[in-house]
């Protein structure tokens, strides 16, 4: 298992956009992690926060460069591989956007219980058009790259131990580790 962790924003040029005013990147780290992801292509990968965003881009997805109201604890709704609503801590202002991919190339496992952001900015600092059935993805699996991506921070101490144990079981199930 290869773990990709939190940190600076992913360089937007890697997903075909210009850098917006809210975006702060470390292109050196991005280059290093793209090389690591290539070297370990067939190894299961787990991304948390920025790591989830990075693995989304590595898997061919895009990012929404800026969203509002996601830097706090909030509820997410799991639909796969379990069902239920759980609290998770978040510190992000960017968001995974797998919806440009074919549906067979990703699975949204969990999403925000309700829309937290009123605006979704791209690199031109403009509100983007969202697909018809848009949800704010919080947990996404990319089968081709064996990448399981968690936008929030299940490891934070404010989250219940039961949820942490559940997340470990989900990660083990999804990545077969």
Enumerate the language-model features and the residues they cover.
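A short acidic, glycine-rich active-site loop
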Residues: 21-31
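Amide-donor transfer/coupling interface in amidating biosynthetic enzymes
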Residues: 4, 29-43, 66-177
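Class I SAM-dependent methyltransferase SAM-binding "motif I" and its flanking Rossmann-like core
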Residues: 63
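Catalytic nucleophile loop
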Residues: 40-60, 153
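Short glycine-rich anion-binding loops that position phosphate/pyrophosphate groups of nucleotides
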Residues: 7-10
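Glycine- (often His-adjacent) and acidic-residue-rich active-site loop
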Residues: 12-19
């Amino acid at each position: 298992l290869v773990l990709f962790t939190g940190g600076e924003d992913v360089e937007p040029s890697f997903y075909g956009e210009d850098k917006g005013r809210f975006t702060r990147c470390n292109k050196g780290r991005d280059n290093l992690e793209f090389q690591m992801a290539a070297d370990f292509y067939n190894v299961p990968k787990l991304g948390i926060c920025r790591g989830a965003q990075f693995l989304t881009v590595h898997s061919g997805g895009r990012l929404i460069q800026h969203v509002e109201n996601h830097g706090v604890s909030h509820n997410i709704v799991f639909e796969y591989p379990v069902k239920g609503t759980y609290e998770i801590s978040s510190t992000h202002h960017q968001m995974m956007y797998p919806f440009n991919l074919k549906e067979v190339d990703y699975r949204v496992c969990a999403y925000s219980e309700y829309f937290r952001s009123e605006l979704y900015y791209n690199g031109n600092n403009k509100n983007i058009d969202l697909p018809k059935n848009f949800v704010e993805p919080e947990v996404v699996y990319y089968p081709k790259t064996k990448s399981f991506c968690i936008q929030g921070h299940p490891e934070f101490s404010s989250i219940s131990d039961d949820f942490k144990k559940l997340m470990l079981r989900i990660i083990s199930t999804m990545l077969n580790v």
